[in-house]
């Protein structure tokens, strides 16, 4: 994950690590008609006050691939650093958004409720930090589990921090001298920091428990859940994969790789209230809840910003984290986000989806993240101002 090596590694994950396949099982592919619009020369003001354009912006913000969809058509699609339309790229935490979509499908089928207790479905976590925790608190990261996700620790990859050890157990880093216990067993060693449902605190391992719950209620491995409930029904074009830990459990919080077109298709389902090609692939109520959220999620997020994030936090004016999406403006724009610059950005007023892969030189650089979203907004302004 360390630059500059991540520029190659992020689209060669299966060559470096053990993965499990995700497939649409030979089903039909959802069409993405093309209506190219020349965006190269659109100009906008960069974060430093200078004038830039779309083409320069993409190169200066370490873009690997991007697919812009407007009114259901691809209007711009580009690849850099050896990628092409069939290349897979690591999604990082946009994987969480995929996991949440599979959760929405399972809830829609009546396999569980969002307010079910985790330990009722998965008694293997009884006696851990998840006692009394609901599925809602897991997916919204308001569970009380004690885990510090400090990406500054990446500067010391040989440390014995819980984050680095977690990444060894997940398969992101070599195990070294650590015993192979896997991410689920590793999770059971975490203590509880606070009552559930009181504050948002971003901790990736929580999403793995959601995946385990989905395995239990569906009776199949998590990568097969994704194949059946996301890849097949959404009409994905390219085979995907997901990193697995030493015991074979998928890293549902960040280990998935797919093509940028398929990530755009995923965003289209959320833009279109859960419908792809006239077929409902996600419950409309789940999509609506994702983009609108609720006061509990907003209040938990506000407490996080006030108490932990500080004034420089890039999301200090955002609404909330809900159903594994970052809601930037309630009911208007929301995004799946992954470290090092992965985006599935949905802008409802303009009917736009932007799927983007990047390899930022650090995990969460405020300037590059803010610059990227600034570029998205410049594209939207151009698209909506064009005559129809």
Predicted regions and their residues:
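Short, small/polar residue-rich loop motifs at catalytic or cofactor-binding pockets
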Residues: 60-63, 87, 94, 339-340
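Active-site Gly/Thr loop motif
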Residues: 237-241, 291-353
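Short, charged, amphipathic alpha-helices and their helix-cap/turn boundaries
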Residues: 73-78, 119-120, 155-196, 220-239
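Structured C-terminal helix/loop/strand segments within mature extracytoplasmic catalytic/sensor domains
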Residues: 333-388
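Active-site-proximal alpha-helical segments within enzyme catalytic domains
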Residues: 141, 206-213, 255-275, 342-358
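Active-site SXXK
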Residues: 72, 90-115, 138, 210-214, ...
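Active-site helix/loop module of the DD-peptidase/beta-lactamase fold
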Residues: 90, 108-151, 189, 205, ...
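N-terminal leader/targeting segments and the immediately adjacent pre-domain N-terminus
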Residues: 1-84, 111-112, 139-140, 144-146, ...
């Amino acid at each position: 994950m360390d630059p500059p090596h991540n520029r190659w590694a992020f689209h060669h994950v299966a060559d470096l690590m053990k993965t499990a396949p995700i497939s649409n099982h030979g089903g039909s592919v959802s069409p993405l008609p093309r209506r190219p619009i020349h965006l190269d020369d659109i100009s906008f003001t960069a974060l430093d006050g200078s004038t830039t354009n779309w083409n320069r912006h993409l190169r200066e913000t370490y873009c690997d691939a991007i697919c812009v969809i407007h009114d259901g058509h691809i209007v711009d699609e580009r690849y850099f650093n050896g990628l092409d339309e069939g290349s897979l790229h690591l999604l990082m935490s946009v994987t969480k958004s995929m996991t949440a979509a599979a959760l929405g499908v399972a809830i829609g089928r009546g396999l569980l409720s969002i307010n079910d207790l985790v330990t009722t479905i998965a008694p293997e976590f009884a006696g851990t930090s998840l006692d009394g925790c609901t599925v809602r608190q897991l997916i919204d990261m308001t569970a009380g589990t004690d885990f510090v996700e400090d990406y500054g620790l990446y500067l010391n990859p040989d440390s014995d921090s819980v984050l680095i050890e977690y990444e060894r157990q997940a398969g992101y880093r070599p195990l070294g001298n650590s015993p192979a216990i896997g991410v689920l067993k590793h999770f059971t060693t975490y203590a509880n920091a606070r009552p559930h449902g009181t504050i948002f605190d971003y901790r990736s391992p929580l999403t793995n428990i959601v995946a385990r719950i989905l395995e239990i209620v569906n009776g199949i491995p998590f990568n097969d859940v994704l194949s059946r409930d996301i890849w097949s029904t959404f009409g994905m074009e390219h085979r995907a994969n997901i990193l697995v830990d030493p015991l074979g459990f998928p890293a549902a919080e960040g280990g998935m790789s797919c093509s940028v077109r398929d990530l755009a298709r995923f965003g289209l389902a959320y833009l279109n209230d859960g419908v792809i090609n006239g077929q409902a692939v996600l419950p409309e109520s789940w999509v609506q809840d994702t983009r609108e959220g609720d006061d509990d999620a907003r209040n938990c997020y506000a407490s996080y910003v006030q108490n932990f994030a500080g004034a420089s936090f890039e999301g200090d004016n955002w609404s909330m984290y809900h159903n594994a999406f970052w809601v930037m403006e309630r009911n208007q724009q929301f995004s799946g986000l992954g470290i090092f610059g992965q985006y599935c950005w949905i802008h409802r007023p303009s009917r736009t989806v932007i799927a983007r892969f990047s390899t930022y030189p650090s995990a969460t650089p405020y300037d590059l993240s803010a610059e990227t979203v600034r570029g998205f907004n410049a594209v939207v302004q151009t698209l909506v101002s064009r005559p129809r």
